[in-house]
Curated annotation (Swiss-Prot):
This is UPF0270 protein VFMJ11_0205. NCBIfam families: PRK04966.1. Disulfide bonds: none annotated. Coiled coil: none annotated. Belongs to the UPF0270 family. Pfam families: UPF0270 (PF06794). HAMAP family: UPF0270. It comes from Aliivibrio fischeri (strain MJ11) (Vibrio fischeri).
Amino acid sequence: MIIPWQDIAPDTLENLISEFVLREGTDYGEVEISHQEKVDQIKVLLKNGEAMVVFSELHETVDIQTKARFNPNLTNHNYD
């Protein structure tokens, strides 16, 4: 289930993004960027609709997914 990022308290969203950035690894490319810059980049992706906050009912977890990686079959469990 997609959770609108605008509905999440600012501090909670900041912590969620920060945790996501830490989990995603350390691909610095040619120029190393700060943790806060990475957080800011994710905020831009959320605002542009290129990333989304997703709640997995099956796993009872919240995550940030890029639009390209989002698979709705992994977030919902259909009992039909």
